[in-house]
Curated annotation (Swiss-Prot):
This is Coiled-coil domain-containing protein 175. The lineage of its organism: Eukaryota, Metazoa, Chordata, Craniata, Vertebrata. Keywords: Coiled coil. The keyword Coiled coil applies. It comes from Bos taurus (Bovine). It comes from the Eukaryota. Residues 131-164, 203-256, 282-373, 426-534, 565-627 form a coiled coil. InterPro entries: CCDC175.
Length: 724
């Protein structure tokens, strides 16, 4: 008996002839030993190649699709499992060889009848082993073919990966350029918006400054009016004082005339006294006593006169103090007038400069608005170009994905065709049950595909309904957006009208301010002329008063020279009495004037306090009004900003909705194409199933014929064996 031994290269599908291992029943029993490196060289090479591929997959330089990576990883795992299976089969074969050697030893000790039966069993087992070996050989060849196909597929995927990597780099460069252009455009837009905001803030600040200047001008006008009123009051007081001084001068003239008359009378009395002196020498003693008494009374009167002089000096000092204060007040009023005039001039210059700056800023705003419109148009163009590029990129990616799916389907179809050819080659040796199972599987696949087609049609109908609802919703939202935009435009037009009305009011107010400044200048010129005239008149009156005082002094000197000592004493006594009376009258008049001045000062302080309080109230009200106006302007500006942002967001939403509508349309067209392809595939499958059923009937007849021949040959061989 001879049994074929296990070849070491059987598991790898080699085309060499299988060596025969002799199994003898004699004493020289050969053990079936197997080498430890059964098919290890090719397996190790494959594993090394797969390890290299795995390392390249794990590295960042290698670029490939995730499907290809997963496929290669699965292949590596399958090869590792095959290597483990190979080692396990080697171990099992060694165990079986040991058992066979033990059985051969047992066979030597058994009788001949039993050995024959065992030989027949071994023959049958050998035949079964040969059939299994042939099946394993076919499987190994199939695995080798699959490995070669996988290698080819790996090479093809590598080429695709390189092409896709280059395409990806090109797309990345193009995308980087687009991103840089977009960033540059956004940067320019940001700079323009910042410049516009700065100009807007400058305009607001200048408006606030103009309002402050207007308020200051109003305050200054009010101060000027008040100062005018005060000046008129002072002027009236001065006129009254001048009239009083004139009256005093007239009274003094009358007094001087009376004094002259008295002097004449005294001269007459002097002559009479000289005449009487001669007659009154006898009565000198009596007169001496009277003179002593008179001297004592004169001393007393001198003390009183000194006290009166002191009081007069005090009153004169007070008068000088009041005069100095009056001069200081006049100087301060003149200084304040000059300062106010300078301020008014500065304010007029500032107003002129502000107008020029306002004109320049308006021109800048006009240019900036033009630039902003140009930038917006450029941004719209760039955005449209981006959309076109993005749509083209998506179309290209979809086209590439479709091509990849088509290629994968074609590869799968080629695989299936190859497997079908192999199965057709093996169908000669297969049974009817296999054909029936395949037919059942095909029927089940057909039913599944029909069910899938029905499900896809149902999904398409649902999607159409959803799309119709979505279109209705979008139309309603677009209508609402149009209404909101119209409302925003109406608000914007109203705000523009309000701004135009306010600008008109501001221009009218500026014209009024200019008219008031001109009127103030004219009134100030007239006031200055009147002041000069009054000063000239006062200087004339002072000169007259000084001349009359000099004349009176000269006359008094002449009187002093003429009168003797006794008469001088009497005259001084009389003069001092009169002066005393005059001083009392002047003191009373000055006290009255002092009281009037105190009352006027108190009234002036009260008026000044009221003026300060009123100015504070006016300033507070102006601050409140400014804050209210600034708040209104800010609120209007924020409303405009929010409306612009809402319009921009609605534009973006509409663009996104349009893009989604386009994508849905493309996806629906893609689904329609897939449905048509599935329908065509179903028709092709029906045709192929009909062809396969015909081939199955033919092969079934061939198989029945071959099976009959096989049984006839078996029967003939059994008969021959029995005959032998």
């Amino acid at each position: 008996m001879a049994l074929s031994s296990w070849s070491p290269e059987l598991g790898l599908g080699s085309e060499k002839a299988l060596p025969v291992a002799a199994v003898s029943t004699g004493p020289s029993l050969e053990l079936c030993t197997f080498p430890s490196t059964l098919g290890s060289s090719v397996a190790t090479d494959a594993l090394e190649q797969l390890l290299v591929v795995e390392q390249s997959l794990q590295s960042d330089y290698f670029k490939c699709n995730e499907e290809a990576k997963n496929f290669l990883k699965d292949v590596a795992i399958a090869v590792k499992k095959l290597e483990e299976m190979r080692k396990s089969t080697i171990d099992l074969l060694e165990i079986e060889s040991m058992e066979l050697s033990r059985l051969y030893f047992v066979l030597e000790t058994l009788p001949t009848s039993v050995s024959r039966e065992l030989e027949e069993c071994v023959r049958d087992a050998r035949r079964v082993n040969l059939v299994e070996m042939s099946e394993l050989h076919t499987k190994i060849t199939r695995i080798n073919d699959e490995i070669e196909f996988l290698k080819k597929k790996i090479l093809h995927l590598q080429t695709d990966n390189t092409a896709l990597g280059e395409r990806q780099e090109e797309l990345a460069k193009h995308y980087g350029k687009i991103v840089l252009s977009v960033n540059h455009a956004m940067k320019e837009k940001a700079t323009t918006t910042i410049y516009i905001n700065e100009t807007y803030t400058k305009i607001n600040l200048e408006k606030k400054e103009l309002e402050l200047q207007k308020t200051y001008i109003q305050e200054i006008e009010e101060q000027i009016e008040r100062e005018r009123a005060e000046y008129l009051k002072k002027k009236e007081k001065l006129n009254q004082e001048i009239e009083e001084y004139k009256k005093l001068c007239e009274l003094k003239r009358k007094e001087t005339y009376a004094k002259k008359k008295e002097l004449d009378k005294l001269r007459l009395t002097m002559t009479k006294m000289r005449e009487t002196v001669t007659t009154s020498t006898v009565v000198l003693s009596d007169h001496n006593l009277e003179l002593a008494r008179l001297q004592e009374s004169i001393r007393e009167w001198e003390h009183k006169i000194e006290d009166m002089k002191k009081s007069c000096k005090i009153l004169e000092d007070k008068m000088l103090f009041f005069k100095n204060n009056r001069e200081k007040l006049d100087d301060s009023s003149n200084f304040e007038k000059s300062e106010l005039l300078l301020k008014i001039k500065q304010m007029t210059e500032k107003l002129h400069n502000c107008r020029l700056e306002n004109k320049a800023l308006r021109e800048k705003l006009h240019t900036v608005s033009r630039q902003y419109k140009i930038v917006l148009n450029e941004e719209d163009k760039v955005f449209m170009q981006k959309r076109k590029i993005y749509s083209e990129n998506q179309k290209q990616l979809a086209f590439i994905a479709q091509k990849e799916n088509f290629l994968s389907k074609r590869k799968v179809d080629i695989k299936n065709m190859e497997e079908g050819l192999i199965t057709l080659g093996e169908l000669h040796r297969a049974t009817k049950e296999v054909y029936r199972k395949q037919i059942k599987i095909l029927n089940e696949n057909m039913e599944r595909e029909t069910q899938r087609c029905i499900i896809t049609q149902w999904k398409i109908a649902c999607l159409r309904k959803k799309h119709a609802r979505w279109v209705k919703k979008i139309k309603d939202e677009i209508k609402e957006l149009i209404d909101k935009i119209q409302e925003a435009e109406n608000r914007r037009s109203e705000l523009i009208e309000e701004t135009s009305i306010r600008e008109h009011d501001i221009n009218e107010f500026l014209a009024k301010i200019e008219q008031l400044t001109l009127e103030l200048k004219q009134e100030e010129d007239a006031f200055v002329i009147k002041e000069r005239k009054l000063i000239q008149e006062l200087s004339k009156f002072e000169q007259r008063f000084a001349e009359e005082a000099q004349i009176s002094k000269e006359k008094e000197v002449e009187l002093d020279k003429c009168l003797p000592q006794l008469q001088v004493a009497e005259e001084e006594f009389t003069d001092k009495n009169r002066k005393f009376q005059n001083l009392i009258e002047t003191v009373t008049a000055q006290k009255n004037e002092q009281n009037l001045l105190n009352n006027n000062i108190s009234q002036f302080t009260r008026d000044f306090i009221r003026y300060i309080n009123n100015t504070k109230k006016v300033k507070q009200e102006l601050k409140q009004l400014r804050e209210h106006e600034s708040y209104k302007t800010k609120a209007h500006f924020e409303i405009l900003k929010s409306l612009e942002n809402e319009i921009y967001l609605h534009d973006l939403k509409t663009d996104a909705l349009i893009l989604e509508n386009k994508r849905l349309k493309e996806y629906i067209a893609y689904l329609k194409d897939n449905i048509e392809q599935y329908e065509r595939g179903g028709e092709d499958l029906v045709r192929s199933s009909s062809d396969l059923s015909c081939q199955l009937t033919d092969l079934q007849t061939q198989y029945s014929d071959l099976w009959a021949e096989f049984w006839t040959t078996l029967k003939k061989r059994r008969k021959r064996v029995l005959l032998k």
